[in-house]
Amino acid sequence: MITKNPMQLKAFIKNKAAEKHISAQLVMQNYMLERLLERISLSPYKNNFILKGGFLISAIVGLDTRATMDLDTTIKGFTLTHEAIRKIFTEICAVQIADDVQFEVVGISDIRETDDYPGIRVALKANYPPISVPLTVDVTTGDMITPREVEYTFSLLFDDRTISILAYNLETVLAEKLETVLSRNIANTRPRDYYDVHILYALRGAECDKATLHRALERTTQKRGSGMILTDYPEIMKEIHESDKLRKLWEKYSREYEYAKDISFDDTCNTIRTIMDAIMM
């Protein structure tokens, strides 16, 4: 999108935020992530990056239904080193688009071992002076995608056009979320994991192939060493459902995010049970 000046961009962002009932900061963050994603799609590395995580979920269900502040990707065809990733992102930042935004790499660091996927975290800045937005991109490698990544058509926030990017298929997105919920059990402190499973299945469940989801979950648990959840899920879900701590965390989450306010913790637990029963029975 071409704007006359930063103030006009802020006005567009403010209007979109009001329309979507989310904060202007979230819209600005997602707009800048979209600008980066388009650069990836136009770079020589288009077929090396595979989109996953919250930004993909937001694209699937809608920004007004799920917002995120960072970009999660997996990369193929490269050895994951600080030097390689810095070179790749420096080249991506140099891709010129008529959107008035300039990107710079601020830093490269390792993702903590305690996170879902060990990998590399890239800190960037998106600049449209005086606007400066810090961005984070997490890059992993060797992820288990079942059966394979797909070509995803990404609709832009303000322009009536799309970009094409490689992404996780729906079944792999759901499989990873289900594994996270079940393996972490009551130690999970992220209500958004429950929300993501619920909203993905509510809005896109009819498109989900149960046999593929079953296989994706099997392969994900094999990779993460959590195969016991496939048989123990009824007991795990009972423990989760009865957890006062998780219920309170959910209630706080649903108060903070307008899109979750009409969904109860019971709803999310019932959705997870429904999916697991459908693919495991």
Which sequence ranges carry the predicted segments?
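Structured mid-to-C-terminal alpha-helical surface segments
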Residues: 1-49, 59-67, 71-281
